[in-house]
């Protein structure tokens, strides 16, 4: 699909404006940002981030009232101590999947009672730390893990609250790599195979564990509500079976995240009001169907909060005209970043738009490919895009909607230092994650031949 560089709208955060073709974030021109912070750099609209997190917090409360559980920000999308601090100020929780994500949450001031621990292969050290500090819940993902968490709880003299991650057998129509609730995946316990019920029976025999509820995550970049509705029904049916067997109802239901955002023309970003009323109706219908009280409902938006709030700013280094098989010319526009700061195109075939960031252009557009500086043919940021034919070295190029899985999946391929993250609000910009240096990379080397 060929992207149009003149698109402005759902892909850009709410405080991005345009003046004579130049991008401004909270009133600061892109050229000024580039001079002060260099390129490539992730620029984060802090006001937009806060607003989106608050919207999910308030939306959950509005829909479910006193049955609203937690909004857990999915920190895998992007985290750092500043983001964790904002989350703490806003009053929502964080979901973490590694010791590093837990460390960032704690360093940012998130109360352990608002931290939920995920992951399909938690280490013994990660489990021990989570139990010792009193996290909200640990989401069980294997029978081995149930024993490990119980052992850690005994060691620390605690009764650890846990959820069971269920795979309800749903095909959420998204990329295979980010679809997580069908049967053939590494995550969770299958309802259909009986594995989920075996996990329930195992936990019931361990007094050091408190089974608080069930969880599922059906995938990412989901725009419809059908899959969420089916998931809610299947999980509540499972909870009804638990009640019928054990004589008590599990108090919590976590329906995960996965709410889509706009990356290209024709896409829209899912807002809380687009999904929560339907989700609420589905939960109430299923609870009536199975004669259940409405449990506390939790959700886990990550990409949907941070994704639309960032753009990446690059500088063009070279432009090359290449004659392709059909005889036409494709411009290869090489920038000073690439797959080391945005791996999603290579991993998932993800699509983006891009725009000259510091000037306007009246030149006709040209068939273009935006590529990085790495020694890899697949180092492509945007495979097909119509960009002005007068793009030259020194131009700034911005790609929006890079807040999720950009910096968090960044690498040091070709020994390239990772870019910084700069938060901008009310006309002021500050670094919240500094740019790596070559000295940082070399500092990890501990031996010489």
Question: What spans do the regions from the language model cover?
Answer:
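A charged N-terminal "starter" segment
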Residues: 1-161, 197, 205-206, 210, ...
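Active-site loop/helix belt of alpha/beta enzymes
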Residues: 2-11, 169-320, 387, 414, ...
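General structural feature for long, well-ordered alpha-helical segments within catalytic domains
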Residues: 29, 45-48, 52, 56, ...
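Secondary-structure transition/capping motifs at alpha-helix termini
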Residues: 63, 111-113, 156-158, 206-209, ...
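Short beta-strand segments
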Residues: 74, 161-167, 215-217, 254-256, ...
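Active-site-proximal loop/turn and secondary-structure-junction residues that shape catalytic pockets
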Residues: 77-79, 100, 121-123, 142-144, ...
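Charged (often Lys/Glu-rich) extended helix/loop segments that serve as interaction or gating elements
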Residues: 278, 284, 288, 292-449
């Amino acid at each position: 699909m060929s992207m149009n560089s003149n698109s402005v709208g759902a892909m850009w955060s709410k405080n991005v404006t345009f003046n004579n073709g130049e991008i401004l974030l909270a009133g600061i021109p892109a050229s000024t940002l580039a001079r002060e912070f260099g390129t490539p750099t992730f620029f984060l609209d802090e006001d937009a981030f806060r607003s989106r997190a608050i919207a999910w917090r308030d939306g959950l409360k509005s829909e479910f009232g006193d049955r609203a559980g937690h909004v857990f920000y999915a920190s895998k999308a992007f985290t750092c101590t500043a983001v964790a601090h904002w989350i703490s100020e806003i009053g929502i929780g964080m979901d973490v999947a590694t010791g590093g994500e837990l460390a960032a949450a704690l360093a940012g001031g998130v109360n352990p009672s608002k931290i939920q621990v995920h992951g399909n292969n938690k280490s013994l050290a990660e489990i021990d730390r989570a139990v010792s500090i009193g996290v909200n819940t640990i989401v069980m993902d294997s029978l081995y893990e149930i024993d490990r968490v119980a052992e850690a709880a005994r060691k620390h003299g605690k009764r650890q609250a846990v959820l069971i991650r269920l795979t309800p057998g749903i095909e959420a129509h998204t990329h295979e790599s980010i679809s997580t609730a069908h049967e053939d995946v590494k995550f969770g316990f299958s309802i259909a195979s009986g594995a989920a019920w075996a996990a329930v029976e195992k936990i019931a025999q361990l007094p050091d564990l408190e089974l608080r509820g069930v969880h599922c995550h059906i995938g990412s970049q989901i725009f419809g509500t059908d899959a969420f509705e089916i998931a809610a029904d299947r999980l509540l049916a499972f909870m009804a079976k638990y009640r019928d067997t054990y004589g008590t109802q599990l108090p919590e239901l976590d329906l995960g995240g996965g709410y889509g955002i706009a990356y290209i023309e024709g896409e829209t970003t899912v807002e809380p009001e687009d999904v929560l009323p339907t989700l609420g109706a589905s939960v109430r219908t299923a609870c009536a169907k199975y004669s259940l009280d409405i449990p506390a409902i939790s959700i886990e938006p990550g990409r949907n909060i941070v994704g639309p709030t960032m753009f990446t700013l690059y500088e063009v280094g070279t432009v090359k005209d290449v004659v392709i098989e059909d005889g036409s010319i494709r411009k290869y526009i090489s920038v000073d970043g690439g797959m080391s700061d945005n791996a999603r195109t290579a991993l998932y075939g993800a699509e983006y738009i891009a725009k000259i960031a510091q000037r306007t252009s009246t030149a006709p557009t040209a068939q273009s490919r935006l590529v990085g500086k790495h020694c890899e043919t697949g180092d492509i940021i945007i495979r097909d895009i119509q960009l002005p034919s007068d793009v030259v070295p020194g131009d700034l190029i911005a790609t929006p909607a890079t807040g999720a899985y950009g910096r968090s999946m960044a690498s040091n391929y070709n020994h390239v230092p990772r870019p910084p993250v700069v938060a901008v609000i009310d006309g002021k910009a500050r670094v919240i994650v500094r740019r790596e240096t070559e000295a940082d990379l070399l500092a990890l080397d501990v031996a010489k031949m």
